[in-house]
Amino acid sequence: MQAAYRSTPPCVLVFSGSDPSGGAGMQADIPAITALGAHSLSVPTALTVQDNVSVFAVHALDPELVRHQAQVLIDRFDIAAV
């Protein structure tokens, strides 16, 4: 059995919050997915006010905005994983 060859990396749809310190959330998901050989498609769900020790605030994004962004990506890309 031969391994399948992909000319483009598989797309992973990620729903996550934004961590401005880079230790978690979308900012950490993107390089982890890239390191595994996939392409990250990010849908932010929340904005946080935090540093590398404490979370001071979490602001959830409007669910309709999250849904709309996800649908745009689903319509355009072949999603391999969520």
Model-derived features: positions:
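Small-residue (G/A/S/T)-rich helix-start motifs and N-terminal tracts that mark the onset
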Residues: 1-81
